[in-house]
Amino acid sequence: MSFSTISVIGLGYIGLPTAAAFASRQRRVVGVDINQHAVETINRGEIHIVEPDLASVVKTAVEQGYLSATTVPVESDAYLIAVPTPFKGGHEPDMAFVESAAKSIAPTLKKGALVILESTSPVGSTEQMAEWLAAMRPDLSFPQQVGEAADVNVAYCPERVLPGQVMVELIKNDRVIGGMSPVCSARASELYTIFLEGECVVTNSRTAEMCKLTENSFRDVNIAFANELSLICADQGINVWELIRLANRHPRVNILQPGPGVGGHCIAVDPWFIVAQNPQQARLIRTAREVNDHKPEWVIDRVKAQVAECLNASNKRASELTIACFGLAFKPNIDDLRESPAMEIAAQIARWHSGATQVVEPNIHALPKKLDGLCTLATLDDALASADVLVMLVDHNEFKAVSGDSVTQAYIIDTKGVWR
């Protein structure tokens, strides 16, 4: 069966670029999302997220009739599920969105269809998804029932893209293809080669699921090392940025850069999936998560110390002091605030501080609900001109373009080494 109609369930930071990539190859793509605003925006040929080069691809695809969006799934040859997989209060994976997406497409499945889970998920999630589908469609056979003879093929194929470079990496990067059977893997590989220039590397679904979790946990552990170094260096009176620069001159050392914590829907979340399934074995992974989760508290303590110094050196009351936080996104040059330590830090500062708290985030036009009423959204120039204490949280290009020599405030907490 050729892939004449492809459905992408979930039109967020991964789903929409994926839909656009298929549509750019002149395939009919139907994007499905429960967000009516997102659906209407896409059908106008516009986008509701910030991602370089995405807007032009979506605009062209919609105008040419290859891409449309809806809130209701339609019969398709292939379905890609790219919905959130957050964790619950106790760090257990929450698969409710995947379950809902799977059950929404089940009535539209036909013989020969391919269903791919892209959402980062615990090991065994693809098999669970296939069970949900089978329970709703007893008239069709699935890989866990009849193997390669299944009517519906099922696979797990995680993305590995960098926000801000998604439209390039989606096409260029290798893709792990984890089918529930060799036939499932072959069909999934056939689908991705429609736009993929990288290699399709075939394995089984459980290994593919663990591969995605491993990649993000590896990065989390390495970031934790850098963040822990920043705490140690602060106590020792050592410039952590200089230290890392010197250490990285060793030919076999490559320390990452510290920051205010770890955010985003991947690195800050996925390691907990391993910990939840392997609590006794995943001790290093758990510790890395705890180190990175603690970093925002450390930053806030540094802010409080700088505010105290500022008050001691001036005649101002705390209510007369202005604190400016630079950046809310979880990484530079994007608008994605998911699991952002910067936003959590800004919110806690605003709740604690009796004076004004400004935030500067060049990639958004309005404050998120979490900060509404707590902070004011300021321009870069206004914040630099009016704030007494500066808190650098995200190294956006706009901030790096400002020379540190021109920043005259004495009280700066720079978690990214931009101005200090």
Model-identified regions with their sequence ranges:
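Structural/interface elements that position substrates and couple domains in central-metabolism enzymes
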Residues: M1-R420
